[in-house]
Regions:
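Formylglycine-dependent sulfatase
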Residues: 1-184
Length: 184
């Protein structure tokens, strides 16, 4: 029997494929280049215009509307709220790749931004990741504290409060010097 391959999927928001050295980019990305040169490079994935719809397509292999992420949850308008395809989380009409991998005996881990649901029953552990440390919302605070805001602070500057989970538990408190890029 042949050995099954290990594989690693990296999702990087706001990074074009041509930004990486392995794809001819000018930015030095030696570690990512080494992974790309030693492995299989997928070169024909078509993205949605924003991150969570793209994430849902990558994890399910289907259209983001079928997966429940017709748009980012933060961008849902009152006209779309509650409509099929606009649930704002990875719905149960689709099977996620980590669920299939677990059934096949793979170990699965997610570290980083999830942006596919804000409740524990929508978090990575509920979609096949046996271990996870993740920031559930998109565009959230990546530090271990929430800055003070008042009513005069424009909404766009307030951002989204950080909401981290480890496996199936919300994290109530992060170290004061926490920064997500260091943790992930």
């Amino acid at each position: 029997m042949s050995k099954r391959p290990n594989f690693l999927v990296i999702v990087a928001d706001d990074l074009g494929f041509s930004d990486l050295g392995a794809f001819g980019g000018e930015i030095a990305t030696p570690h990512l280049d080494a992974l790309a040169l030693e492995g299989l490079r997928l070169t024909d994935f078509h993205t949605a215009p924003t991150c969570s719809p793209t994430r849902s397509m990558l994890l399910t292999g289907t259209d983001h509307h079928i997966a429940g992420i017709g748009t980012m949850a933060e961008a849902l308008t009152p006209e779309l709220e509650g409509k099929p395809g606009y649930e704002g989380y990875l719905n149960d009409r689709v099977v996620a790749l980590p669920e299939l991998l677990r059934e096949a005996g793979y170990q699965t881990l997610l570290s980083g931004k999830w942006h596919l649901g804000l409740k524990l029953e929508q978090a990575p552990h509920a979609r096949g990741f046996e271990r996870s440390f993740s920031l559930l919302p998109g565009a959230a605070n990546h530090y271990g504290f929430e800055p003070p805001y008042d009513e005069t602070t424009p909404r766009i500057l307030k951002g989204t409060p950080a909401l981290y989970v480890e496996d199936d538990q919300f994290i109530d408190e992060l170290p004061a010097d926490f920064y997500s890029s260091d943790a992930f």
